[in-house]
Amino acid sequence: LDFVRANPEKKAIVICTDIAKYDLESTGEYTQGAGAVALLVSKDPRLMEVENNFSVSTKGVFDFFKPHRTVKKENIGITNNEAWQGVLESEIEIFKEQPVFDGQYSNDCYIERTTDAYFQFKKLKAEEGILYDSWKAIIMHLPYSFQARRMFAEIYAADHPELAKAYQKEDSEYFSKLKALSKSEEYRAFVAEKFAPAERASSLIGNMYTASMFMGMLSTLCDYNEKGEDLTGKTLGFIAYGSGAKSKVFEGKLVEGWEKVIEKQALFETLEKSESIDIETYHQLHKKEKTADTVSKISFFS
């Protein structure tokens, strides 16, 4: 965005892609996924305008990391820097693709950062009412499809004038009240309107890390276009977050003709062509005993 603002005559392509792989039988295994999303940024967008208003909240925490360490050859009995498994350097690097993490601690960090960033953004916008009511849909990072709806309950209560006083963290029953709220008909209706459209693709793809939020945006727009609903002039709220921990909040407004862009995206049609594999094949792929070349693949470019 800054590049295009500084060079309005130019356009930029942003590519978000990643692979979310976790250990077999770990609590993160079911969230695995992979994919990519490409976005075209220009001064005259045909889909959505993004204002230069962002709020960011950060705090240094150690909730997630991918193991990477070095071991000196002399420490494992290799003298004179002899070659070992093709390694010529005096140190051997050990790296593991699957992360070490504490899921519940991460969730606590995410809620803390997103809540702080959300209310910073509300202050930035000088919004006197309920901020999320001004958003047609809420687009959040989805490591699994229901993550956003489960995280957002605290913000939902805190920004609601009738609920804020009843939901105080100092209250010993705060979390039990919050759990009950998340199961209420009122909150379920809110989720169906604000989050469910983004969850459609996530439930079929899984976690894509950096690409996840923008896949949620595409899923939301494809869902509404499928229903024939005109979103011209409507605002989407974006809440990005991640381990480490950080959150960013911003808005996007749909421009006239947005549906013509979305009509070209065969998102759900493509996902319907996905092929199931048996558990044995999955385990072989995960352990790299078998490569993806031996499994039927589907590529999608739009």
Go through the PLM ranges and name each one.
Residues 1-6, 29, 132, 136-302:
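Claisen-condensing/thiolase-fold acyl-transfer catalytic domains that form or cleave C-C bonds
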Residues 12-14, 84-94, 186-192:
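Active-site-adjacent bridging/hinge elements
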